[in-house]
Amino acid sequence: FYNSASKIRVRVLSRNANDRFDEAFWARRIRYAVDYRRTVMGQDFDNCRLIFGEADGFPGLTVDRFGPILVAQVLSLGMELRKQQLFALLLQTLHAGGAQIDAIYERNDVKLRQKEGMEQGTGFVTLDGLRTDLDGHVTIRENGILYDVDYIHGQKTGFFLDQKYNRRAAAQLAQGKHVLDCFTHTGAFGLNCAAAGAASVLSVDVSEDALTTARHNAALNGLQDRVEYLCADVFDLLTKLAEQKRGAYDYIILDPPAFTKSSATVANAIRGYKEINLKAMRILPRGGYLATCSCSHFMTDDRFRAMLADAAKDAQVSLRQIEARQQGPDHPILWNVPETDYLKFYLFQIV
């Protein structure tokens, strides 16, 4: 479809000349997306990304499922014009498979909409059988951990589902470790480590609001005495700890926000990523563990690996790679759409 007000003026829906963009076409696309998640997510189908934009053939549309709640972001005019039809078809498909959906909430409070010539806004979707009077909170279970998801005020759709299996992988190294969980947001990595038997966990974030939610999540799981929370700038904290040389932590997790959202700021982002990784490597003892990631597709895997190699050289350590991971399969990577390949996640031992 075409939008003269957008920097992305043309978005391709299909390369099949025989396709007609009628209700049957959209119903088929939605069925493919839902059936794919049922297959790859299995028991985790209750909490996953149901529609991932171009990767599912819906350019500009994201839909996350948190149990009985669907949270949508509509970032292209073509999807905006069809959203009521798409929501109805998605609801129909989920109900046919036995899923109970109570509400759909739109999180269209994104500046990108203005670049598409659309207004920002949020609110419950009005469709037969859906509620519009909920308080904006839902409790989900991921990897055995309970979380209170605030889908009205939380970042993006309320919870970062793409790190689901990376959190589980990180927790497998945590038993008996003293963990420093940086950029914790609502506490997920730290809680996974605490539940896995970490000796101690310090979870750090610059946002007191995020830490309030993290503490609440810890209490939901009976882990409030196993995790300590600190409101601080991670860059400043790592600087102080690095000055102390090898410190009290033998496992550091770095899950920063995207340091770049455009190609113009990649160089600055590389410097930021290198700074936190270099300091983490200086803090960790030989034999310690590092989990590190980037969620920006502009920070390609080649750039990320080169940055890590430079940081290791400057820290005078070697990196023993344990795992290289990406986003979960509910965020599928379409090889001809590079933007869908965005999350890099590495587990290392410092040797």
For the regions a language model picked out, list residue spans one by one.
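Conserved class I S-adenosyl-L-methionine
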Residues: 176-185
